[in-house]
């Protein structure tokens, strides 16, 4: 669309990665160009850019205020991370239409470079949620005398690195629960569940190895299952709004009375989802692995193991099973070479998330009926996706995982 003699106004970023996607982190320099194409000479008062990053939360609730009276309560909150303005052409005052200070731009294409530095302090990862978002953008404004300004806004992605190679994220997660079913005056045997995963931190594209034992001493047929859930929490005016959504799930074999099932590293793959957001005061994004037993006619028995979805994959010697790493010192530059004896590295964000996926959310995933009842509502997979390119690191999976378990008495004979 031609606006006067301005044919086009665009913004392009100088990307820091090979995938040509504008992705930045705190402390990075964001640079780019405002591209202006005109079909004839134009007079310009100013060409400005405005860059901003902020988290914003908003939701409404309906309340009763007496007989046949209701009102809507709005909850909003905002956190600003940075606010940068710069003038590429002209001067600050746009209301001055005097001939002095006008700049003439000739017909053709013109580029005007801009640059600014993101704060060194941690920034929240870009995110689009049900009741809030974290967004970063650059807006260009072209002001001309006696004409409306031409404006354009373009977003860029910011993410904070979460390195899963930290002691807290490399520690195993485990738990045990038991449930006894009662029906009037009759009590059946217990249903017991024990589950363990090798660590707390993972990256998208990895598969979680689940080690579990389910013992059914009840009289009912039960089904062991597992699911990854994302929890979005939004905070405003002292209130909190939470949304829980299914990310991935799996189902085990039905387990009849007196039987036991063991999972020796059953795999559940993490789809392309946004990293955990843990440092924003008004938006929090967390993940959990739920290993549970579907019990017909009763509340399910479930075990909740916390997860952190990071951006930097597991180091080759980050695994607890690497004994060589603690016994020798060497130049780590050799890691860039091929290591045929090691398992394949977890895929990078660029491999996991395509450009098409980045533009479109995941299709809704149908949730399990039992968890719909527990959460009192349907679940929707509304996951913000990114196309990241973390360092090309490798991971190591223990070829002989510890499968030992505590000896438990078998179900009592009936």
UniProtKB/Swiss-Prot annotation:
Q: Which family does it belong to?
A: Belongs to the arrestin family.
Q: Where is this motif: PPxY motif 2?
A: 391-394
Q: How does it sit in the membrane?
A: Peripheral membrane protein
Under InterPro entries, the record lists: Arrestin-like_C, Arrestin-like_N, Arrestin_C-like, Arrestin_domain-protein, Ig_E-set
GO BP term (any one) = protein transport
- Please name the taxonomic classification of the source: Eukaryota, Metazoa, Chordata, Craniata, Vertebrata
The main location class comes to cytoplasm
> What is the designated name of this protein?
Arrestin domain-containing protein 3
Return the GO cellular component terms, semicolon-separated. early endosome; lysosome; plasma membrane
């Amino acid at each position: 669309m031609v606006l006067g003699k301005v044919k086009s106004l665009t913004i392009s970023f100088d990307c820091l990665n090979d995938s040509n996607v504008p992705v930045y982190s705190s402390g990075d320099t964001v640079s780019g160009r405002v591209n202006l194409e005109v079909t004839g000479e134009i007079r310009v008062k100013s060409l400005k850019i405005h860059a901003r990053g902020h988290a914003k939360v908003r939701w409404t609730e309906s309340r009763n205020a007496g007989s046949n009276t209701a009102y809507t309560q709005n909850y909003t909150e905002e956190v600003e991370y940075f606010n940068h303005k710069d003038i590429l052409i002209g001067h600050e005052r746009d209301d001055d239409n005097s001939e002095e200070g006008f700049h003439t731009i000739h017909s053709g294409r013109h580029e005007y470079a801009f640059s600014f530095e993101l704060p060194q302090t941690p920034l929240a990862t870009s995110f689009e949620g049900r009741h809030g978002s974290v967004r970063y953008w650059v807006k260009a404004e072209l002001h001309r005398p006696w004409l409306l300004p031409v404006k354009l806004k373009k977003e860029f992605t910011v993410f904070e690195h979460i390195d899963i190679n930290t002691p807290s994220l490399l520690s195993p997660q485990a738990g045990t629960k038991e449930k006894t079913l009662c029906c009037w005056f009759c009590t059946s045997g217990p249903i017991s569940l024990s589950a363990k995963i090798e660590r707390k931190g993972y990256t998208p594209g990895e598969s979680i190895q689940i080690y579990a034992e389910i013992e059914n001493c009840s009289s009912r047929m039960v089904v062991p299952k597992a699911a990854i859930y994302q929890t979005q929490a939004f905070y405003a005016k002292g209130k909190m709004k939470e949304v829980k959504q299914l990310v991935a799930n799996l189902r085990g074999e039905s387990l009849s009375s007196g039987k036991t099932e063991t999972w020796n590293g059953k795999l559940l793959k993490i789809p392309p989802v946004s990293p955990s957001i843990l440092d924003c005061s008004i938006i929090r994004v967390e993940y959990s692995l739920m290993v549970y037993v579907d019990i017909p006619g009763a509340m399910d028995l479930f075990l909740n193991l916390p997860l952190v979805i990071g951006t930097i994959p597991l180091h080759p010697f980050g695994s607890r099973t690497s004994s060589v790493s603690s016994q020798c010192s060497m130049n780590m530059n050799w890691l860039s070479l091929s290591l045929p004896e090691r398992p394949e590295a977890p895929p990078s964000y660029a491999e996991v998330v395509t450009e098409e996926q980045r533009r479109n959310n995941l299709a809704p995933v149908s949730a399990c009926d039992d968890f719909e009842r527990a959460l009192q509502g349907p679940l929707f997979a509304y996951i913000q996706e990114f196309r990241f390119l973390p360092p090309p690191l490798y991971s190591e999976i223990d070829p002989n995982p510890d499968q030992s378990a505590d000896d438990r008495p078998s179900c009592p004979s009936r």
